Amino acid sequence: MSNPKNKKEKTFLGIDYGQRRIGLAYAASPLFISLPIGCIEAGNTVEATAKILFNIIQERSVSCVVLGNPIPMQKGQKSALQEEITKLSSLIQESCGVEVILWDERLSSAQAERMLKGDCGLSRKKRKGKTDTIAATLILTSFLESSPPKIFLKKTCPKPPVR
């Protein structure tokens, strides 16, 4: 089995960002299967949340972050949550030097909620936090399934922006 600490491997962190909770999923070579890794509490600010995520990115030697982007159903509108996600993306790129991909996450939380409620029969209280983790897994899976094979062979990631 591969060693996730090997910096030459392509590793992915999927993030379902929320203002209270953040769901996380992870994938690494050789299989690139999206696995849920849990849910964390968001920081009081986007900057505080970026610091929390920085530690996870470093700990898991992540080379690419797939950050769920809640694109509104009606074009032309940008939500406050999207503004935070754009800021978080920039902070992660600047502090970690990893590639961040904003990925359409429309309805991922609703799909996760249906899965947990219908298939698993979990109560609302037991679904808390699990929905975010499953949504992160769905976001990362969607990205991995739609990506060309060459992305998995890429050994290096973009350098952080020069200040």
From Swiss-Prot:
Organism: Chlamydia caviae (strain ATCC VR-813 / DSM 19441 / 03DC25 / GPIC) (Chlamydophila caviae)
Compartments, record wording: Cytoplasm
GO biological process, one term: rRNA 5'-end processing
SUPFAM superfamilies: Ribonuclease H-like
GO MF annotations, alphabetized: nuclease activity
Gene3D superfamilies listed in its UniProt record: YqgF/RNase H-like domain
Primary localization class, coarse: cytoplasm
SMART domains: YqgFc
HAMAP family, sorted: Nuclease_YqgF (MF_00651)
Species lineage: Bacteria, Pseudomonadati, Chlamydiota, Chlamydiia, Chlamydiales
Stated name of the protein: Putative pre-16S rRNA nuclease
Keyword Nucleotidyltransferase among record annotations: no
Highest taxon in the source lineage: Bacteria
Similarity field: Belongs to the YqgF nuclease family.
InterPro entries, sorted: RNaseH-like_sf, YqgF, YqgF/RNaseH-like_dom, YqgF/RNaseH-like_dom_sf
